[in-house]
């Protein structure tokens, strides 16, 4: 099993790489790529951790080598959000980075499962898909926007609010991965119930949790540690799927005849990536209105990504 992390020297990339070094199955390879000159040092640093995962670092001119024979590629590369910026402000900076990296994947490991972390995910996932389409190697089952951060935040916030064991909390989150496009389905959380007031307060807290971190770090960064944990969790779901286990997780994927061209759904994962896109079930009146209200924004975000590649 070979996992490549593109953007491994950044805040998310380092946290993610650490968790993969300690969490991937024995015998796995962890390939770290970044344009930052520190990346070989990150690889050396991680290599001192005694686990049976081999680590190698690759600099700016070695993208193809970093990606060769990768089974899974995770992309946290790009510019992080700063105070006053929203995810849309990142598009102009990060769209070009994502395009270049996707072209590298097409050249070196077109059959890999590709997990996209780089914001704005609503628009960067379509860019990757369009690069694959242009090359004639697109497989919708193998391209994912990683929305796990919305799920783990929801789990943490619900457990905190209700005073329950976080290990027992499961919160479905659908839609997109920024602002109001993030839709936690609190009506489907088992074992707890919420008042209308709690739903009205908790939903925007989940949607704006990234801003909460950006502001709390006072210009010193964005959500790197929690995002690293979220991406590692999703990567382990992909690994289990590749190993033949039956895994259901949430991801932003291409959907046919769905709410939008791309939408976060529960998905059954397996050896081909997405084996099945599952229904997100019944929505409450609040959730139905929230979904209908945000679809225009989500579709605009998607169009921006597609148009960038036109």
Curated annotation (Swiss-Prot):
Pfam families: Ldh_1_C, Ldh_1_N. The active site is at 177 (proton acceptor). It catalyses: (S)-malate + NAD(+) = oxaloacetate + NADH + H(+). Substrate binds at residues 81, 87, 119, 153. NAD(+) binds at residues 7-13, 34, 94, 117-119, 227. GO terms for cellular component: cytoplasm. Its EC number is 1.1.1.37. CDD domains: MDH_glyoxysomal_mitochondrial. It is an enzyme of class 1 (oxidoreductase). GO terms for biological process: malate metabolic process; tricarboxylic acid cycle. The keyword Heme does not apply. One of its GO terms (molecular function) is L-malate dehydrogenase (NAD+) activity. InterPro entries: L-lactate/malate_DH, Lactate/malate_DH_C, Lactate/malate_DH_N, Lactate_DH/Glyco_Ohase_4_C, Malate_DH_AS, Malate_DH_type1, Malate_DH_type1_bac, NAD(P)-bd_dom_sf. Keywords: NAD, Oxidoreductase, Tricarboxylic acid cycle. Catalyzes the reversible oxidation of malate to oxaloacetate. Homodimer. Belongs to the LDH/MDH superfamily. MDH type 1 family. This is Malate dehydrogenase. It comes from Pseudoalteromonas translucida (strain TAC 125). The lineage of its organism: Bacteria, Pseudomonadati, Pseudomonadota, Gammaproteobacteria, Alteromonadales.
């Amino acid at each position: 099993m070979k996992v490549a992390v593109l953007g491994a020297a950044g805040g998310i990339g380092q946290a993610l790489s650490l968790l993969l070094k300690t969490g991937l199955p024995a015998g796995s390879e962890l390939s770290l790529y970044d344009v930052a000159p520190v990346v070989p040092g990150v690889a050396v640093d991680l290599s001192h951790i005694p686990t049976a995962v081999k680590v190698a670092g690759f600099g700016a001119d070695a993208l193809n080598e970093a990606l060769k024979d990768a089974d899974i590629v995770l992309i946290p590369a790009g510019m992080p959000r700063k105070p006053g910026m929203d995810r849309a402000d990142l598009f102009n900076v990060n769209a070009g980075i994502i395009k270049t990296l996707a072209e590298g994947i097409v050249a070196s490991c077109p059959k890999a499962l590709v997990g996209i972390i780089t914001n704005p995910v609503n628009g960067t996932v379509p860019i990757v898909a369009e690069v694959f389409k242009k090359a004639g190697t697109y497989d919708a089952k193998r391209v994912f926007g990683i929305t796990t951060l919305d799920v783990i935040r929801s789990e943490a916030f619900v457990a905190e609010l209700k005073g329950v064991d976080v290990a027992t909390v499961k919160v479905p989150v659908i839609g997109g991965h920024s602002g109001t496009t993030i839709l936690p389905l609190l009506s489907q959380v088992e074992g707890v119930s919420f008042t209308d007031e709690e739903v009205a307060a908790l939903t925007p807290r989940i949607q704006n949790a990234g801003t909460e971190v950006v502001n709390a770090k006072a210009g010193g960064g964005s959500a790197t540690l929690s995002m690293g944990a979220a991406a590692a969790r999703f990567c382990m779901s992909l690994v289990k799927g590749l190993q033949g286990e039956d895994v259901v997780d949430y991801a932003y994927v291409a959907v046919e005849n769905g709410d939008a061209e791309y939408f976060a759904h529960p998905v059954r994962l397996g050896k081909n990536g997405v084996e099945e896109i599952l229904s997100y079930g019944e929505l409450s009146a609040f959730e139905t209105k929230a979904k209908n209200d945000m679809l225009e924004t989500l579709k605009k975000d998607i169009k921006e990504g597609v148009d960038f590649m036109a």
